[in-house]
Structures are given as structure tokens and as C-alpha cells.
Curated annotation (Swiss-Prot):
The keyword Cell membrane applies. It holds the Pfam family Mntp. One of its GO terms (molecular function) is manganese ion transmembrane transporter activity. This is Putative manganese efflux pump MntP. Probably functions as a manganese efflux pump. The chain crosses the membrane at residues 3-23, 41-61, 62-82, 105-127, 143-163, 168-188. It is found in: Cell inner membrane.
Length: 190
């Protein structure tokens, strides 16, 4: 996977956390920049670790399904992207954007884990594509840190407008990446 595909994947994966951080930023009366950085770091570190875990799980199984690697990656991205799109169209009952005044470390870690489960599944798919997982995980973590920090700072202004649309956009990006992987592996790319 080249750098532009890695960046697209990373920012696509960060949309879940971005949507959650907009909600968090909207809940806090006046989020400080250091709160946004702290939240971004927590989300970024967790989002970087989970694809490594998924990759390790997928790597051990890769010898059994190498012939189907592109189908596995495509299916995972399609399911995850589709789920993000569906959740983006759901009503405001989404627990990740819940208006909770508590900005504790435990709450942030729980939210970060909840939004990073997709990254673990992506890690499984990446094991079949034989990518540099450390590089990819670092890019995913950095992209998530940037997007969460931005989401926190602008959340109180655009939370009601963009919160769910960000998740839909992220889901569509993942579906597009899955289609591109399938397209390339079926021999249509030059």
C-alpha cells in the first residue's frame, strides 16, 4: 500500500474518533487546547495499538487464506464502512456523542477503545496485504490524534451540523478503499 492509500485509510479510520470528539468538544463548555491535545493523544495511541493487535491475529491466519486476501480486506472494509454509514444516519441516540460532563481519563479511554475497534479489524485485513504494519499504525495514530484534537476544538461550533456526517464520510472512504483493493488485486490496475 502506497503512502497516499495509507493516508486515506488513516484519515478514514479517524472519522469515527473525529465524530466522537466533536461530541466531546460540544459537551465541554469551553474546551482548552491542552484538553484537546490530551484527548487527541489518548485516542491516537489507542487507535495505533489496535491495528497492531488485529494484524498479529490476522498474520497467524494468513498462511491459510492468502488466495483470498483481497476478498478478506474488501469484505472487512465494506462491512466496517457500511456500519459507519448506517451509524452516521442513525438518530442522536448514539452513545459516543452522549452529553456527559465528566471528562475523566477512564471515560476518554473507554470512548477511544470503542471507536478503535474498527482499526483492529482493519489490522486483520492488513495482515493479508503484507503492508508495513508499524508504519501504517503510526500513520493511523497520528491522523487520529490530529482529527480528535481538531474535533475537540471545533466541536461546540459544528457538532450538531457535522457530527454524524463525519462518520458517513469516513464509512464511504473505507468502502472506496475496499473497492480499490479488490480492483487492484483482480488485475485491473496497471
Amino acid at each position: 500500500m502506497n503512502m497516499s492509500a495509507t493516508l486515506i485509510l488513516a484519515f478514514g479510520m479517524s472519522m469515527d474518533a473525529f465524530a466522537a470528539s466533536i461530541g466531546k468538544g460540544a459537551v465541554l463548555h469551553n474546551p482548552r487546547f491542552r484538553d484537546a491535545i490530551r484527548t487527541g493523544l489518548i485516542f491516537g495511541v489507542i487507535e495505533a495499538i489496535t491495528p497492531l493487535i488485529g494484524w498479529a491475529l490476522g498474520f497467524f491466519a494468513s498462511q491459510y487464506i492468502l488466495e483470498w486476501d483481497h476478498w478478506v480486506a474488501f469484505t472487512l472494509l465494506l462491512i466496517l464502512g457500511g456500519r459507519m454509514v448506517v451509524e452516521g444516519f442513525k438518530g442522536s441516540s448514539d452513545c459516543r456523542c452522549e452529553k456527559v460532563k465528566n471528562h475523566s481519563l477512564a471515560l476518554l479511554v473507554c470512548t477511544a477503545i470503542a471507536t478503535s475497534l474498527d482499526a483492529m479489524a482493519i489490522g486483520v485485513g492488513l495482515a493479508f496485504l503484507q503492508v508495513n504494519i508499524l508504519h501504517t499504525a503510526m500513520v493511523i495514530g497520528c491522523a487520529t490524534m490530529i482529527m480528535v484534537t481538531l474535533g475537540m476544538m471545533i466541536g461546540r461550533y459544528i457538532g450538531p451540523i457535522l457530527g454524524k456526517k463525519a462518520e458517513v464520510m469516513g464509512g464511504l472512504v473505507l468502502i472506496g478503499i475496499g473497492c480499490n483493493i479488490l480492483y487492484e488485486h483482480l488485475g485491473y490496475a496497471a
